[in-house]
Curated annotation (Swiss-Prot):
Key words, A-Z: Cytoplasm, Nucleus, Ribosome biogenesis
Lineage, uppermost ranks: Eukaryota, Fungi, Dikarya, Ascomycota, Saccharomycotina
Subunit text: Associates with the pre-60S ribosomal particle.
Functional note: Component of the ribosome assembly machinery. Nuclear paralog of the ribosomal protein P0, it binds pre-60S subunits at an early stage of assembly in the nucleolus, and is replaced by P0 in cytoplasmic pre-60S subunits and mature 80S ribosomes.
A single BP term in Gene Ontology: nuclear-transcribed mRNA catabolic process
Official protein name in the record: Ribosome assembly factor mrt4
Amino acid sequence: MPRSKRSKLVTLAQTDKKGRENKERIFDEVREALDTYKYVFVLQLDDVRTPVLQEIREAWVGSKLLMGKRKVLEKALGTTREQEYKENLSKLTKYCSGVIGLLFTNETLDTVKEYFEAYSRLDYSRPNSRAPITFEVPEGIVYSRGGQIPIEEDVPMAHSLEPTLRNKYEMPTKIKAGKITLEAPYLVCKEGQKLDVRQALILKQFGVALAQFKVIISAYYDNESSTVSELNINKKQDA
């Protein structure tokens, strides 16, 4: 395995003592992992939920997933030829964008590909994402799932939520006989439409969790060959 470039001094940005200690800890953990594992993969983790991270960590016992401020992770890798911790490692930083995690592992490339190509979780849609379905709340009594399941299997939405629906979510609701009601069907969004904050909150309120979350892996570094290779696992293709 190629020797590390340990002689380079890297200065982290000025910050408070606790924040600096945390940056130094992450920095040191990255470099220790680089000396321990054969591969390091760049995972794109924008909008990731805590349970997803827990699942991945539990599935990859024996490997190490590190997260932190992107600039700290990049500095630990080395952003230039002169600063890189190992030969050609600086080339990996060009694949670091948004919220990232570094997965260090001795598992084979095929194992990594198979796991992350198969891994998928349903999640609530975020603002600026595309609506997974056309969602319309039927007229009449407003039920907790907004018409997604038969009313015999559902329950009316709690009347205490009516001000939230009317004022925060701008739905034309009223209270009739103690029940939240709509005098006409209310269209929340159409499939493929770009969601605003209000629409995303309404979908969450009615339990619409149909957005698919997948981990994107853009590239990896091989410690033995000192090479960076592009992967593009789960990368969305441009329309």
